[in-house]
Amino acid sequence: MEESQRYLQLERSQQHDFLYPLIFQEYIYAFAYDRGFSRSSLSENPSYNNKSSLLIVKRLITRMYQQNHFIIYYPNDSNQNTFWARRNNLYSPIISEGFAFIVEIPFSLGLIYCLEGKNKKIVKSQNLRSIHSIFPFLEDNFSHLNFVLDILIPQPVHVEILVQTLRCRVKDASSLHLLRFFLNEYCNSKSLITPQKASSSFSKKNKRLFLFLYNSHLCEYESIFVFLRTKSSHLRSTSLGVLLERIYFYGKIERVVNIFVKVKDFQANLRLVKEPCMHYIRYQRKSILASKGTSLFMNKWKSYLVAFWQWHFSQWFHPRRIYINHISNHSLEFLGYLSNVRMNPSVVRSQIIENSFLINNAIKKVDTLIPIIPLIAAXXKAKFXNVLGHPIXKSVRADLSDFNIIDRFGRICRNLSHYYSGSSKKKSLYRIKYILRLSCARTLARKHKSTVRTFLKRLGSEFLEEFLMSEEDVLFFTFPKASSTLWGVYRSRIWYLDIISINDLANHKSKL
């Protein structure tokens, strides 16, 4: 018990109690605005780039010093005499981005301290940032497992949950009060997630702050897995120690486990959920917990997670958000792929002197397939096809040139081929590419008030192929003599290490 308490105790040198005064410093906003340092999505917003001048920041800080005028308010009636009424669109992203940068400081320093304190070198793992790095992991491990928990992580339904989650790591009460005031006044209600309009508006205008709060919320949730994994494994992971450096964490976990099994011995309770062969994967709100254990063991974990969310986050976690599935007869939908484990039969002939034997072996293999029905639905939502998958023409601006139209369709097609290059069967990918190519042809024919056949006959089919050429086709044209060798590469799965976000069509969103 004492060893665990020392392991989970927050170091004195990592307690930062003076974050609030940084809000009044001009250089903080300069750091937050710098693209190379922050890499914030707000820096990509062209409407905000022209408004973040040093003069505006100075005026903002001057008004913030005037206590009578420092009122953050988001009313529908803009006639009220408030600090935010006239300059809502101007000051809101500046303060939110600066505040998000400030509260990230303890986390960044904590990570550096954790690595340097253990004589570790900070290694840039660029390849592990790729989404495709997850699938080789699935291929290596999931074929030996039995059950999987398919978990949909609930969103925080109250702003106080986000503030309390951040309070576990940040001890500056003034900054937390400002954050609470900022969230409550912006949403104009007690709920952040329940009103969809308020949540959507907040996440779009304050992307950096929203992502930081949501990631802190998920980090709090995932810390229990790191804790149990550390306690149940002899090869303890030290690189994730920063996730456990929080206030009162041990007491909360002990209380949750005691509630779960209603026994006072914490170590005895911990053995009930120990499993050395357990794997955890998460992307956004979707998480997977796979184990080699039995169905009873997975039901214990399901009950444990429900109790953890209800007592630790004070919110209802519906048991139907967690599905227990057997890996061998269930297709797992994750990151736009359908992954399942199938038996790959093979016949081996063995001959001993005059006798020969035929041995049938069945090897488990992880297949990654393309979900064609959701992709066709996404293409129909983006106006590339109808609900049956028949290509249709898109309405485009009259001032767009043919080259720009073809370039847009070609970029979408190449990105889709790039993302689904790891599919075991690419027939579905060919169908989606066919929909995009014919939709592009019909869009151009509609623009020129002609038919598709007449348009292609006039320009030639090579005109489209030049821009819609996939990466595999480039290999064949570049190395024609090695076509037989490249054909095997073309049919095999290829995982790329430069994909940092899920494809729009794969994510079933119409952002195109």
Swiss-Prot record:
**Disulphide-bonded residues:** none
Q: Name one Pfam family in it.
A: MatK_N
Keyword terms, alphabetized:
Chloroplast, mRNA processing, Plastid, RNA-binding, tRNA processing
What is a biological process (GO) this protein takes part in? RNA splicing
* Localization (cell): Plastid, Chloroplast
One cellular component term from this protein's GO annotations in UniProt:
chloroplast
Question: Membrane-spanning regions, if any?
Answer: none
The answer to whether keyword RNA-binding applies is: yes
Q: Does the UniProt entry include the keyword Nuclease?
A: no
Q: Name one GO molecular function term.
A: RNA binding
What family does this chain come from, according to its entry? Belongs to the intron maturase 2 family. MatK subfamily.
- State the function annotated in the UniProt record: Usually encoded in the trnK tRNA gene intron. Probably assists in splicing its own and other chloroplast group II introns.
Its recorded name reads Maturase K
Species in which this protein is naturally found: Erythranthe guttata (Yellow monkey flower)
Lineage runs: Eukaryota, Viridiplantae, Streptophyta, Embryophyta, Tracheophyta
